[in-house]
Amino acid sequence: MITVSPAEPRDAAAIAALLEDLGRFYDATESEPLDRRIGQINEAIFTSPPAAYALLARDGDQVAGLAAYSFLWPAAGATRSLYLKELYVPDAYRRQGVGKLLMHAIFETAATLGCSRVEWTTDTGNIAAQAFYAELGVPTHRSKVFYRVEDTGSGLGSIVRGQT
């Protein structure tokens, strides 16, 4: 039986493994050493206050999926929204309802905490993810344009200084 619960500090290595698998899914070519990734996970999720949160789907002792999220403010009025950064289910658990369980847990978390909405993105080429969200009955919003600035080694500050 698959269960969903908040991640705990003892889960950091399992989260690191899922994120490594996620990176391979997106054809990432670089990976940081495991101890550094675990340190980043602990710093992001298990400090007070946390910068991010994670829900894990479990099949007994096996981790069957991850939903990583943060809160954004302001949303509608002075409310906040829950931003789902990653929903990831390894191949072995796909098409078994794990993603739906994680999404329902995300929606329940948002409702319990008084969020006015849940938001997320998916890659334009990830047709399977788009079909999954459509099956959930979630409409696509095309009213926003997404921007991203990445640190390419010269530091994000170079953009602020006009050195792009």
Name these PLM-found stretches:
Residues W73-L84, R94, H141-R142:
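A conserved beta-turn-beta hairpin within the catalytic core of GNAT-like acetyltransferases
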Residues A16-E43:
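Conserved GNAT-fold acetyl-CoA-binding loop/helix
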Residues A111-T121:
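Conserved GNAT acetyl-CoA-binding A-motif
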Residues V89, R95-E108, A131, E135:
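Conserved acetyl-CoA-binding loop-helix of GNAT-fold acetyltransferases
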Residues E119-A129, R148-D151:
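Conserved beta-strand-loop-alpha-helix junction that forms the acyl-donor binding cleft
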